[in-house]
């Protein structure tokens, strides 16, 4: 290369890096220390997603990381209960594959629709006769039930309701179609995410921050501290 020339580099942002970790007040990071204060276990996961790289971060990887984090916490803080705090990202709120999803159902029984778990008709059901009763989400022949069957078993009259609105339901409506009506039932609304189930079954607590309030997220404080430290170092 001749003097004064520089190599032409590929355009782009370079390789992506994704870092997922848990922070706590006592240690800064969730780690397990030995007698000398050296880190022997940690919950941090680093991936390099993208073309020819690692798979993108998803719920499966998150759940595996949480399992590891719980084991580390139990070793580092025996006889203590952890409170895990998450924001409202889609991975954090992911439901299990057999979750109740009204808009994934057909109007009639069978057809191409996934099988959903059985449920209990909620105490808030409009018709008190069916409150608290178990409800199977499959027919006797093993086919997934459709919207109409599930609603009629709860005492609703669906004769004048369409299956689903197109393209979307009116924002303020709660009973514009069968799917919207069923989706507003308490057992469909109040479902537990896979993250929360994993944590509570291990004897710990889980808290999800309200949407659109990032100022409540402890990670924002960590990010601000890092930026302040970096700016101070650059100003020296």
Language-model features: locations:
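Short functional hotspots at interaction and active-site rims
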Residues: 1-236
């Amino acid at each position: 290369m001749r003097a004064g020339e520089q190599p032409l580099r590929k355009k782009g942002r370079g390789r992506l890096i994704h870092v997922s970790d848990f922070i706590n007040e006592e240690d800064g990071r969730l780690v397990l220390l030995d007698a000398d204060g050296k880190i022997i276990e940690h919950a941090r996961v680093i991936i390099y997603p993208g073309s020819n790289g690692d798979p993108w971060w998803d719920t499966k990887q998150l759940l595996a990381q949480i399992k590891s984090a719980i084991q580390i916490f139990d070793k580092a803080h025996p006889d203590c209960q952890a409170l895990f705090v998450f924001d409202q990202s889609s991975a954090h709120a992911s439901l299990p594959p057999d979750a109740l999803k009204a808009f994934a159902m057909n109007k009639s029984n069978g057809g191409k629709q996934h099988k959903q778990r059985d449920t209990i008709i909620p105490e808030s059901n409009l018709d008190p006769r069916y409150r608290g009763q178990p409800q199977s989400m499959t027919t006797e022949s093993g086919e997934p039930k459709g919207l109409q069957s599930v609603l009629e078993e709860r005492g609703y009259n669906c004769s004048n309701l369409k299956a689903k609105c197109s393209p979307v339901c009116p924002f303020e409506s709660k009973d514009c179609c069968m799917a919207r009506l069923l989706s507003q039932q308490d057992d469909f609304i109040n479902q537990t995410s896979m993250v929360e189930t994993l944590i509570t079954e291990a004897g710990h607590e889980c808290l999800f921050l309200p949407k659109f309030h990032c100022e409540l997220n402890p990670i924002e404080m960590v990010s601000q501290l890092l930026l302040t430290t970096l700016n101070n170092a650059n100003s020296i």
